[in-house]
Amino acid sequence: MPGVGISRIVRIAVAALVALAPLMTPAHATSRIKDLANIEGVRQNQLIGYGLVVGLNGTGDTLNNIPFTKQSLQAMLERMGVNIRGATIRTGNVAAVMVTGNLPAFATQGTRMDVTVSAMGDAKSLHGGTLLVTPLLGADGNVYAVAQGSLAIGGFAAEGAAASVTKGVPTNGRIANGAIVEREIEFALNKMPNVRLALRNGDFTTAKRIAAAVNDFLGTKTAEPIDPSTVQLSIPAEFKGNVVALLTEIEQLQVEPDTAAKIIIDERSGIIVMGRDVRVATVAVAQGNLTVSISESPQVSQPNPLSRGRTVVTPRTAVGVTEDGKKLALVKNGVSLQELVDGLNGLGIGPRDLIGILQAIKAAGAIEADIEVM
């Protein structure tokens, strides 16, 4: 019957809408506080060390050209009881390298971390090499980790008598889990009376919204925005000594971030990135291409055979100017980013021409955004 058929269609439509509701993107997406801010003080620490890579197949440093490699090799052998004073060292299987890595936050003794190894001398390739024991120091001069292991190289180099080929960077490699943490950085998180959230992108509105979300969750005013990049959180009494549990809950809170209207321009590559809040006032845009062509066709004048004249070269220059038909487009007040792009694309404008047009619109005071040129 018609009534039964219509009611069935309605039920199916309602069920489809309910099923698709979770997939619908809101007009203003929210993000976790975990993705918007870091816990102040919880960060990685950079480490650096100097070492030697051995086992290279003749692609290491030239010892006569790189004195520090030779000195390091001599010092290492002497520490191991090998006396080479006065001896001539000839090898191409050793290279001096710098070793870098990032010590993770809260890393404990025995934790492994990745390191990057980079050649310092004239080594052609580190392929097949092994890094010897290398202490890794922090900015305070203390040793926090020790690195050693076989290198993984992303490139290669090969050469013959008259030709050579190189792919990638064969003088740079990595050692996965190649360093062991030997010293911990003291950071008593659970004993802190307050914690600060450092926003990755400072903004007054976002900082206020984060503080409001935390206060609503805890039911008390414990969070306060200090500046656009910092929200200070006083630890409630029930979470004293258990700050980790509090931060675990706070990190999952959803907040709608606010961003300033900004246009990023990279003139070298022609890349333009515009935020969603960019607005333009009413403005007319005209764009035309002007082409100037110059051609030289010198004319040679020869004298009579029996005269004493000289050959003369007379310059002849032809200059031509062509201009494409200009187009005029009207960009209305308060248009969105998509409407702005569509309007400018209607003029047949490329990315590099668009850069100049956006800067001109900004100079005219018709664009409500900051333009940052990289």
Swiss-Prot record:
The keyword Signal applies. Keywords: Bacterial flagellum, Periplasm, Signal. Pfam families: FlgI (PF02119). One of its GO terms (biological process) is bacterial-type flagellum-dependent cell motility. GO terms for molecular function: structural molecule activity. It is found in: Periplasm; Bacterial flagellum basal body. One of its GO terms (cellular component) is bacterial-type flagellum basal body, distal rod, P ring. Assembles around the rod to form the L-ring and probably protects the motor/basal body from shearing forces during rotation. Belongs to the FlgI family. The basal body constitutes a major portion of the flagellar organelle and consists of four rings (L,P,S, and M) mounted on a central rod. This is Flagellar P-ring protein. It comes from Nitrobacter hamburgensis (strain DSM 10229 / NCIMB 13809 / X14).
